[in-house]
Amino acid sequence: MTKPIVAIVGRPNVGKSTIFNRVVGERVSIVEDTPGVTRDRIYSSGEWLTHDFNIIDTGGIEIGDAPFQTQIRAQAEVAIDEADVIIFMVNVREGLTQSDEMVAQMLYKSKKPVVLAVNKVDNPEMRNEIYDFYSLGFGDPYPISGSHGLGLGDLLDAVVKHFKEEEPDPYDDDTIRLSIIGRPNVGKSSLVNAILGEDRVIVSNVAGTTRDAVDTEYSYDDQDYVLIDTAGMRKKGKVYENTEKYSVLRALKAIERSNVILIVIDAEQGIIEQDKRVAGYAHEEGKAIVIVVNKWDTVDKETNTMKKFKDEVRKEFQFLDYAEIAFVSAKEKQRLRTLFPYIKEASENHKKRVQSSTLNEVVTDAISMNPTPTDKGRRLNVFYATQVAIEPPTFIVFVNDVELMHFSYKRYLENQIRAAFGFEGTPVHIIARKRN
C-alpha cells in the first residue's frame, strides 16, 4: 500500500517549513537514531484523521537569478510531478506577487489537485485580506497561521479529500514483490534487464497500481515475482539524476509496495553517503533487503578481494547487518543466479512466525546468559515475549519498566532471537511494553 504524497510549494519566506513541521509534529525528531542511517528531512510522514501520507518540503521558487534558483525550481518540478496533492502557500502580509503567479502557472500545467493556503493570517481582521488570492484560480483560499497553528485542520480536511481510494493489490500473497533501488548510475536499469533476460525467467509487463508505473511479472524456479515500477527505474533525464533528494520520492512509492528491496551499489566507486541514505529509506520501512554489489567484473581481484569488500560493506552499512550481499555484473550477466536464493530467503524470513513457547525459551536462556540491566538499583524484569506481526517480524516484550530496556539490551535480545530462528535478510523489530 502506497501513502499519498503531499508537496508544499511556494515562493521563499511564505512559511512552508513552518507548516511542514506543524503537520509532521514530533515525527521530525528522532527518538532513537539507527546508527549509520543518514536522515534526510525534506520529507516525512504526516497523519490526519484516518489518513497517513508523506509530505514534502520544497525550496522557495522565485523570479530572477537568485543563487541555486535553477536547481531549486527543478527540484520543485520533480516534487510536483511525484505529488498526489499540492499545498500552494502564499503570504497575506506581502500580498499577491509575481513569483506567486509564476508558481501558479507551474501548478496549472501539472493538472494536479491544488489547495491554496494563505499563511500568516494571525488574527481575524486579516481574513479580509485573503480575497486577492482568488485571482490565482485555485478556488477558496484557506487562511492559516503557521506560527500559531490556526486553520490547519480545515486545510488538511481539504487536502485529504483529494486522496484517491487505494486500489486493491493485484498480486497473490505468494508473489514476491521486488524493487531495485540505488543512487544514479549504479546500474539499476542494467540489473533489471539482466534479471529479466536470465534463462528460465518468463516475463510479462502489466500496468502498475500507481500512476504511470509499469510492473513486470516474471517467474523463476517455480516462484512468481513482480518487479515493481520498472518504468520508474528506467526513467532517465537530467532533472531526475540531479535532484536525488526529490527523485527518491519515486523510489519511496516502489519501496512501500514491495516485500524485498535490492539495494544496488557500484563496485568501482565503492560506498558513498548517498548509498547509505537510499538504503536507510528501505530499512526504515521495515522491508527485507539484499545488498547487490554491481560491476564486480571491473574490479581487479586478489585472493581476499571479495572478503575485503564484504567487510567494507558491513562496516558502512552497520544498520543492515542482517542483509545478504551478492556480487554480480549486470552488464556481463555474471553471478546473477546467486541473487534468487537470497531474494527468496529474505522474503520467507520477512513472513516468518515463531511459536510463543519456543520464543520464550530463547528469551529465558538469553537472560540467564546475560542478566538484564539495572538502573539506580532497579532491575529490568522481562515477563513474557510474543510475536505480534510479520513483514517485518515484530515482537513485544512485556517488562516491569520500559525505561529500563536499554537499546543495547534490546539489541542483544534481537541477536539471540536471530541466532535461534534465522531471519536472514529481514529487519526484526522488538518493542518493550509495560505489563499491566
UniProtKB/Swiss-Prot annotation:
Pfam families: KH_dom-like, MMR_HSR1. Residues 352-436 form the KH-like domain. InterPro entries: G_ENGA, GTP-bd, GTPase_Der, KH_dom-like, KH_dom-like_a/b, P-loop_NTPase, Small_GTP-bd. CDD domains: EngA1, EngA2. GO terms for molecular function: GTP binding; ribosome binding. GTP 2 binds at residues 182-189, 229-233, 294-297. GTPase that plays an essential role in the late steps of ribosome biogenesis. Associates with the 50S ribosomal subunit. HAMAP family: GTPase_Der. Keywords: GTP-binding, Nucleotide-binding, Repeat, Ribosome biogenesis. Gene3D superfamilies: 3.30.300.20, P-loop containing nucleotide triphosphate hydrolases. Belongs to the TRAFAC class TrmE-Era-EngA-EngB-Septin-like GTPase superfamily. EngA (Der) GTPase family. GTP 1 binds at residues 10-17, 57-61, 119-122. Residues 4-167, 176-351 form the EngA-type G domain. The keyword Nucleotide-binding applies. The lineage of its organism: Bacteria, Bacillati, Bacillota, Bacilli, Bacillales. GO terms for biological process: ribosome biogenesis. Disulfide bonds: none annotated. The gene is der. This is GTPase Der.
